[in-house]
Design a protein with these regions (language model features):
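Extracellular ligand-binding interfaces
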Residues: 547-625, 636-638, 647
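Exposed low-complexity, polar/acidic, P/S/T/G-rich flexible segments that act as propeptides
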Residues: 637-656
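Extracellular beta-strand-rich recognition modules
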Residues: 627-633
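Bacterial N-terminal signal peptides
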Residues: 4-13
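Glycan-recognition and processing domains
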Residues: 497-565, 593-600, 652-659
Length: 659
């Protein structure tokens, strides 16, 4: 096998007839246990069949975040090392495979700079945005570099992605070329908009709640050999109540929410089945390497839940995520998307290749692997060379290693440490050990062969290992990722609560318009004075009367969603601000529950980034009642402190204040 791969590398053109096709598929916000072959009750027979005839990875890692996982997947490098969304320090998969004779195409979510056709994809259909309406799309849809008008009726993104994939693959087949096709489904990312039949298929199945579903998933994971029979699962965290503690109305709405998730995942499987059937019919399936992965674990951020007066299968309905169900979907692990604990970074990975796989079909691979390994693996199997230089870019060295030895029936050699970083969540996987920090909190150390659920922090017992791994993390951060600022600073020494203001607040929150069956009274989705959600590039902490924002990028801010405001405007937002950041400041708002900011109304305002305190009064000339706010106090990296933040009515009455 190694000799063949060596010959491929010497002269790829001579072996064109033997080169495999590549079908790379990425789901969005899929939890570790969301597929049947990973423990789920959701019906995914086609993906389960791929797993039965191929490999499942039990320790396949991502970056815990949408865009950075896509960078690592396509580039074979850590996201910061590759230049993040710009890809300025990388050469990506289609640019590697096309010179080896491959027809390259993509369908689905891009979420990076420019367009796929600017980075070697010869064909592209999909949306450039990070999320889209499943039925109506958005203005970023493109077809081969040109704007694509989404049809007003009969359109659904998951289906459209496979429709165009089949067209592009047929085009490659007609040209008698091996092909590389990348499908990036936006499912099951919010807004949760399943097709009607897919939603109704699961209605009522989740009335038993997240405690029972998680227990059943963990039991199945052990039964199918994904987890050792004696492995422990993480307990339900304090920030999630027992299912029985929810009101009857909450239980009803949360059950419907999970039915929407299940419908989205079921549809991915149905469309994968349609695609696989066409490959088999054309005689392509045996020599096609299919790799199915996810960009991060299940999402915990509550952005509007199910409501009793709406159904999710309409373009005008936008249900959001649930922390309780994210916990269940990431079984048996802790935490979620954006965190570097296993719940955020360990997700399903299925590899299927009948013509080349030498492992026993149905095997579970326990060797740690990462999205950065995909490019070197595909390049080796294709006999393609990875360029060390490229016009107008400065490619950095690859971070990943080839998984070809595993495919060939062998074992992985010792790999370099897996570097983990998103914002101030960080970690390092090095052999049997994992070092991890929650939002710059103290380093925690876990022995992964005996503690995958990260229940027993042994940092105090092994200070030498912590010191060695922490030094390695900082060395990689500075010298490989060239990361500076707060993300690269030493971690704290005092422990803090592991909480995020964007997670569901079940103690004071029920989904919009939910009526408790106990008393029939309407309750708001969110108390107006609940903590705002930290947006992208933002870490939020509270110190006494102050909201402290740590901006790590160019689009920071705070989101105030589903406000329980009944008094009509105009409104005034008052606060004191001290900024050590830079860039423009903006305020967005909407009175429409269906409008997702930054769509809506907008106000630019001036901030002096001089480290001094300044009084701010922002007027919103709005006669209707306010539904949501977004406050962006800066546009660059640095710290911003806000205190005395309050929303006032026309008569000066305080309608809400934060914290």
């Amino acid at each position: 096998m190694r000799l063949i791969l060596f010959l491929f590398a010497l002269c790829p053109a001579l072996f064109a007839a033997s080169q495999p096709n590549f079908l790379l598929v990425m789901a969005d916000d899929m939890g570790f246990s969301d597929l049947g072959c990973y423990g789920s009750e959701i019906e995914t027979p086609h993906l389960d069949k791929l797993a039965a005839g191929g490999l499942r990875f039990s320790q396949f890692y991502n970056t815990a975040k949408c865009h950075s996982s896509r960078v690592s997947l396509l580039s074979g490098r850590w996201s910061r090392q590759a230049g993040d969304e710009s890809l300025q320090r990388a050469v990506i998969l289609p640019e590697v495979l096309a010179p080896a004779g491959y027809f390259t195409a993509m369908t689905g979510k891009w979420h990076l700079r420019k367009q796929p056709t600017d980075f070697g994809f010869q064909r592209y259909f999909g949306h450039l945005s990070g999320a889209t309406n499943y039925f109506a799309g958005d203005q970023t849809f493109r077809l081969n570099g040109q704007p694509f008008a989404v049809p007003e009726t009969g359109f659904y993104t998951t289906i459209a992605n496979v429709d165009h994939a089949l067209k592009f693959i047929a085009e490659a087949r007609a040209a008698k070329k091996p092909w590389f096709h990348y499908i990036a489904f936006n499912a099951p990312h919010a807004p949760l908009q399943p097709l009607e039949q897919d939603f109704k298929k699961y209605q009522g199945r989740y009335d038993i709640g997240w405690d029972a579903i998680r227990a059943a998933r963990v039991a199945k994971q052990k039964q199918i050999g994904l987890l050792p029979a004696d492995s422990a699962e993480s307990p339900r965290p304090d920030h999630i109540p027992a299912w029985t503690k929810l009101s009857a109305g909450q239980r009803s709405d949360e059950s419907r929410l999970m039915s929407a998730y299940a419908g989205l995942i079921d549809r991915i499987d149905q469309e994968m089945g349609r695609l696989i059937a066409e490959l088999e019919k054309a005689g392509d399936l045996d020599n096609t390497v299919i790799l199915f992965v996810s960009d991060n674990g299940a999402c915990p951020f509550h952005r509007g839940g199910a409501t009793p007066n709406t159904e999710p299968y309409h373009a005008t309905t936008r249900w959001g995520d649930s922390t309780g169900w994210a916990w269940a979907r990431n079984s048996p692990f802790r935490f979620y998307k954006q965190n570097q604990f296993e719940g955020g970074i360990s997700t399903p990975a299925i590899l299927h290749w009948p013509a080349g796989l030498k492992q026993k079909p149905g095997s579970v691979v326990s060797s740690p692997a990462h999205l950065v390994d995909v490019l070197p693996t595909f390049a080796e199997l294709a006999g393609a060379k990875v360029p060390t230089s490229y016009p107008d870019r400065q490619p950095s060295p690859l971070a990943g290693v080839s998984l070809a030895p595993i495919i060939a029936g062998g074992q992985m050699e010792a790999r370099p440490p897996i570097h983990l970083l998103f914002s101030t969540d960080r970690g390092l996987r090095d052999g049997e050990w994992k070092l991890v920090s929650f939002q710059s909190g103290p380093w925690e150390l876990y022995h992964m062969p005996t503690d995958r659920a990260e229940l027993h922090d042994v940092a105090a017992q092994h200070p030498d290992i912590v010191q060695r791994m922490a030094k390695r993390w900082h060395d990689m951060t500075a010298n490989v990722l060239t990361t500076q600022g707060k993300e690269a600073q030493p971690v704290a020494t005092a422990a803090t609560a592991k909480l995020n203001p964007g997670w569901s607040h079940y103690d004071d929150t029920v989904p919009t318009q939910t009526k408790s069956k106990a008393n029939g009274k309407k309750k708001p989705a969110q108390a107006a004075s609940a903590l705002p959600r930290a947006r992208k590039d933002t870490q939020l902490s509270v110190s006494g009367p102050q909201l402290i924002l740590h901006s790590t990028g160019t689009d920071p801010g705070l989101a105030f969603e589903r406000l329980a405001i009944e008094t009509p405007g105009p409104y005034t937002l008052e606060f004191r601000l001290q900024s050590k950041s830079s860039g423009p400041a903006e305020l967005y708002w909407t009175t429409d529950p269906e409008t997702i900011l930054p769509k809506g109304k907008h106000l630019d305002f001036e901030v002096k980034h001089d480290g001094e305190w300044h009084e701010m009064k922002l007027r919103m000339d709005e006669a209707k009642t306010l539904h949501a706010l977004r406050l962006d106090p800066c546009g660059g990296e640095g710290e911003v402190k806000i205190e005395g933040l309050m929303l006032k009515a026309p008569d000066g009455k305080v309608l809400a204040k934060w914290p």
